[in-house]
């Protein structure tokens, strides 16, 4: 199997992953992350299962991209791929928690996930200072290097960077930004990642030497 065929096969990971990222924020119960009724609902489980599946699919897509690009990649691109991989580990871990453990907590100890519960008071430092920045910077860095490599068009880069930046706009109960920021963040970032997969699938070329 050639490197090009591996890239085209694994590019489906970026396409599906982008769809799942968009699904995560668009399906998620509107208005807030808090509340036992939200956290235990089928809608919540569907949204955060998309969150978890997005991480798995995007990691699979990155494997093919690494096969194609890493042998001749510069330091910047290599670092961006490693950062994106780390971002997917963190993103997948939080997705496993919110899709499986969170609904159990909501059903059996719902007061924990209320706005004034232990899940949000004090505010979760891991989410604010590690998970969100790593995800946002990891996505933006990978998309930027793919644009520089002439794989991704500028429109996709802009959509992805704007979406990644919106991850830094926390909504209720973490802060007061409108929920539309969260919904749009995943929609735009997911569009850009799916666009990357489409570009790789239909125009995969060997790494520049």
Model region roles, listed by residue range:
Residues 1-209:
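Hydrophobic, aromatic-enriched alpha-helical segments typical of multi-pass transmembrane helices
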């Amino acid at each position: 199997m050639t490197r090009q065929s591996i890239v085209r096969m694994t590019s489906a990971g970026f396409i599906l992953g982008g769809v799942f990222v968009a699904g995560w924020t668009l399906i998620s119960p509107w208005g807030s992350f808090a509340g036992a009724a939200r956290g235990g609902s089928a809608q919540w489980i569907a949204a955060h299962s998309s969150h978890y599946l997005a991480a798995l699919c995007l990691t699979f897509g990155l494997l093919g991209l690494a096969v194609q690009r890493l042998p001749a990649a510069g330091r910047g691109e290599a670092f961006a791929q490693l950062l994106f991989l780390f971002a997917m580990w963190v993103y997948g871990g939080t997705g496993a928690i919110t899709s499986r453990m969170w609904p159990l907590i909501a059903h059996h100890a719902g007061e924990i996930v209320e706005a004034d519960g232990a899940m949000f008071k004090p505010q979760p430092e891991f989410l604010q200072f590690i998970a969100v920045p790593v995800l946002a910077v990891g996505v933006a860095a990978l998309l930027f290097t793919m644009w520089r490599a002439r794989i991704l068009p500028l429109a996709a880069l802009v959509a992805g960077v704007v979406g990644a930046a919106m991850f830094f706009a926390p909504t209720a109960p973490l802060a007061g930004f409108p929920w539309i920021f969260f919904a749009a963040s995943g929609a735009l970032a997911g569009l850009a990642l799916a666009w990357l997969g489409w570009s790789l699938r239909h125009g995969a070329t060997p790494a520049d030497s």
